[in-house]
Amino acid sequence: LFLAYIFYPTLIRIFTKRKIAEYIKAIFPIQLLAFSTSSSSATLPFTMEHSQKSLGISEETASFVLPLGATVNMDGTSCYQAIVVIFIAQIFGIDLTTTQYFTILFLTVLASIGTAGVPGASVVMTVMVMSSVGIPVEGLALILGIDRPLDMLRTVVNVTGDTFVATIIDKRAS
């Protein structure tokens, strides 16, 4: 949530001179829909329409950047996967090497790009990352019970990142 409510709005303020509260208020309906559906893909039509109306993003930018972002810009998912893998390693008492940390970083970025924008899809990719660095996948059972609310929050971060990128690109293009 740091990304959605502090980092992105601060960069919006720096690059577009838009007030932080104004930006958060404008994207809140998008975030609310993302939270309730847990799907970047399901929110895409509303995200495109609402970002044009409330953020003033041009139709050209919205129709190119937002679908691309809904597919590959899964920053909430990437952060989640890295945190889960490291958390489970700590639970099992596994000391990770620097190489393993960089492997986790690299794989979570790649896995987040390949994660479908549907609820629960990141669990499969997290298993892949865990097995590639030698962490027992059984540990994921500790997270699965609370994955749904976490998925809802990840989706909020993902769509906020999409609107952030679209806003910056639209500002730079005009």
Where would I find each of the regions flagged by the language model?
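Residue-level signal for transmembrane alpha-helical positions in Major Facilitator Superfamily
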Residues: 2-6, 43, 80, 121-122, ...
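Alpha-helical transmembrane segments of multipass membrane proteins
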Residues: 3-8, 73-76, 111, 150, ...
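Juxtamembrane/transmembrane-helix boundary motifs in multi-pass membrane proteins
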Residues: 17, 21, 25, 95-99
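Helix-loop-helix junctions within the multi-pass membrane cores of secondary transporters/permeases
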Residues: 30-112, 166, 174
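Transmembrane alpha-helical segments and their short flanking loops
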Residues: 82-174
